[in-house]
């Protein structure tokens, strides 16, 4: 007999919930005006839920370093607020990493456009 398929693995559901809640907390809970406009792109959680790596980007690249400092400083507060919103046995320790995939994608796109512009048009 076949086992019924599960829609989402629990770890995936937890990752998505952490991502949603952190996005809301960062938007409404960070009071530091130095922080730029922060977007939470992805969350990776270890199997035992002890650590979560949060990938983020900022709208203004000039505020990238300051935003990193603000997030590191607010890490404990954000974890505490997460514990009030998410019912888990263990709330993961948060680690913030700037998501460079967007920048890499844009530079690759620019390189492709450059090569396409240099290539002569064939009739």
Curated annotation (Swiss-Prot):
- Cleaved signal peptide residues: none
Name the SUPFAM superfamilies for this protein.
Ribosome-binding factor A, RbfA
> Which family does the entry's similarity section mention?
Belongs to the RbfA family.
Coiled coil ranges (UniProt) are none
Q: Which organism is it from?
A: Neisseria gonorrhoeae (strain NCCP11945)
Q: Does the keyword Cytoplasm apply?
A: yes
Record protein name field: Ribosome-binding factor A
Question: So what does this one do?
Answer: One of several proteins that assist in the late maturation steps of the functional core of the 30S ribosomal subunit. Associates with free 30S ribosomal subunits (but not with 30S subunits that are part of 70S ribosomes or polysomes). Required for efficient processing of 16S rRNA. May interact with the 5'-terminal helix region of 16S rRNA.
